[in-house]
Amino acid sequence: MRVRSKGQYRLFFNDGTGVYATFSGNKIAGYIRVDLGKVVYAVCSSEDSSGDEILFFGSDDGYVYQMDKGTSFDGSAVEAMLRFSYYHYDSPTRNKRFRKIQFEMSGDSTISLQFQPDYSFSDPDVPAGRTRNLNIEGSGGYWNIDNWDTFNWSGQIVSTAEENLDGVGTNMGMLILSEATYEQPHILQGVTVHYSPRRIRR
């Protein structure tokens, strides 16, 4: 299935899973695996009366579902997971004390996430990071530009939240989890990590 508005090509498999390939121009920007929880038998991409792209799929239960619409999977929570690759912050053999992390996100509603940092490629000799909960207020908007009731008054355009870290390692990766039924979609704009360099690992 081709999704013109997002520059995506979507492939679906007979177990309800799929792969979305996103393009930037003629180049692949990335892939993401999805699990719709329903077997996709037929797909349709069309336009509504406003000219906006709408997507549908038919499943083995006889129902037709609209994709990329609403906040749930037919009333069930949407689960999302993002794993960052390990990054050494430009010094792969130097230990670092990771002190704080700041998330930058945009979304129309409050965002509840869990995240777990992971140090030194999950080395069993390095203490594991603990799982933390994070609540981020929905983003603000611009008067006379954004749609009414889709932004928070007096809110930041990009919402931020920070949390202290207490890990030591040569690098850090991270797992971010989201599971919600009523949250609007959100976008992770950036992550800033504060750390102090330590000795070179020998």
Regions found by a protein language model. Give the residues of each.
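Beta-sheet repeat architectures centered on beta-propellers
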Residues: 1-202
